[in-house]
């Protein structure tokens, strides 16, 4: 394979992996939001004695939604295998190790998904399922940045570097609190599923307050990255992040004051994924060994 062809394929397969790892979060959320979490009431079978839905299941159309999401896991797995094999045959050791993680993570997700079903959609397992996906998305951003030659020789000023780390940590806190809020709210995935024994109003307020802190930090990062010539690339990413935050905040408040309709909650999940991708892109340029970009 020619060098230019290899480079192009590397970009495409790593982008496909990022899209797949992000997309499965959204489809998984749709399963929950449509009350289809137990559409296939067992695992690995869809219904006792059959890997696929069968006519006459009491779960009705929910079985097709849940089974469809399970089937998408094989697509995500196939893409992660292709990414790893390509890296193994063509790339340096460091990217080979990182490219192995989406493959392992996808397999773990399948098992965790099974545990989630077998525990009756307990919110703790649903939350773990989502947070593992968030980790895989961050890893996928890092891998794509490598294949996309997303590098810079500039070293961030210390104040910008520290600010990026703080924004990353607070952004992660926003995501975690968002999942706890979800685990305390009405969209459990099935009418019999348990919920966290928390006051939804209190946890939602805490989530909203953390979001306000996060947006304030993003505005601060916009300012300091703008006035530092060495961090213009940070300014561009932060500007995108700020726009996403505004849209995400608007959706968040509208959904709350309209009784959390599943369509708006789905859009909020998409916004959360896009927010996290932008945060992960910022983190690539920090001095943190785990987060920073590969060379």
Language-model segment annotations:
Residues 1-295:
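Polytopic transmembrane helical bundles with strong interfacial aromatic enrichment
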């Amino acid at each position: 394979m020619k060098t230019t062809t290899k480079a192009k394929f590397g970009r495409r397969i790593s982008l496909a992996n990022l899209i797949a790892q992000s997309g499965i979060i959204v489809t998984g959320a749709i399963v929950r939001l449509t009350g289809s979490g137990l559409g296939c009431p067992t695992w690995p079978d869809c219904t006792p004695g059959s890997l696929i839905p069968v006519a006459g299941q009491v779960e009705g159309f929910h079985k097709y939604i849940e089974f469809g999401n399970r089937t998408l896991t094989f697509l995500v797995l196939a893409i992660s295998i292709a990414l790893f094999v390509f890296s193994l045959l063509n790339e340096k050791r460091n990217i080979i190790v990182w490219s192995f993680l989406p493959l392992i993570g996808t397999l773990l997700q399948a098992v965790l998904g099974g545990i989630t079903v077998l525990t009756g959609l307990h919110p703790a397992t649903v939350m773990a399922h989502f947070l593992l996906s968030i980790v895989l998305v961050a890893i996928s951003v890092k891998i794509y940045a490598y294949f996309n030659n997303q590098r810079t020789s500039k070293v961030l000023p210390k104040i910008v570097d520290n600010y990026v780390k703080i924004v990353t940590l607070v952004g992660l806190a926003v995501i975690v609190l968002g999942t706890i809020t979800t685990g305390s709210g009405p969209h459990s995935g099935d009418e019999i599923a348990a919920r966290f024994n928390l006051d939804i109003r209190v946890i939602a307020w805490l989530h909203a307050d953390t979001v306000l802190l996060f947006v304030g930090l993003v505005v601060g990062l916009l300012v300091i990255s703008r006035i530092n010539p060495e961090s213009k690339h940070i300014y561009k990413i932060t500007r995108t992040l700020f726009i996403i935050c505004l849209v995400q905040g608007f959706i968040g408040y509208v959904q709350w004051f309209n009784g959390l309709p599943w369509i708006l909650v789905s859009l909020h999940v998409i916004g959360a994924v896009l927010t996290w991708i932008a945060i992960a892109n910022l983190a690539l340029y920090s001095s943190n060994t785990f987060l920073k970009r590969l060379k």
